[in-house]
Curated annotation (Swiss-Prot):
Gene Ontology MF, one: ATP binding
Superkingdom as given in the UniProt entry: Viruses
Record carries keyword Nucleotide-binding: yes
Signal peptide feature range: none
Protein name, entry field: Core protein OPG142
Name of the coding gene: OPG142
Cysteine-cysteine disulfides: none
Lineage of the species this protein comes from: Viruses, Varidnaviria, Bamfordvirae, Nucleocytoviricota, Pokkesviricetes
Entry annotated with the keyword Hydrolase: yes
């Protein structure tokens, strides 16, 4: 996923699929990245928030905070999950 330079990244586990606006992969958290447990502030310079693997409580906290400070920006949610095949084989009985 491409992340804008004016975006804030809030994560529970760091994803492996983030790229900045120039196309380089963001390997490690930087100064615009926070965990859900850390404190952060939103201001007018931040145009969007990327939430990575949030819990339902984390989503609710961010939504309440956004509404309370009347921040007008976009929120994007990214869920990462392993693609594990089912323990059985699907068979088509034609």
């Amino acid at each position: 996923m491409f992340v804008d330079d004016n975006s804030l990244i809030i994560y529970s586990t760091w994803p492996s699929t983030l790229s900045d606006s120039s196309g380089r992969v963001i390997v490690m958290p930087d100064n615009r990245s926070f965990t859900f447990k850390e404190g952060f502030k939103l201001d007018e310079s931040i145009k969007s928030i990327l939430l990575v693997n949030p819990s339902s409580i984390d989503l609710l906290k961010i939504r309440v905070y956004k509404h309370r400070i009347k921040w007008m920006g976009d929120i994007f949610v990214l869920f990462e999950q392993e693609n594990i095949p089912p323990p059985f084989r699907l068979v088509n009985d034609k």
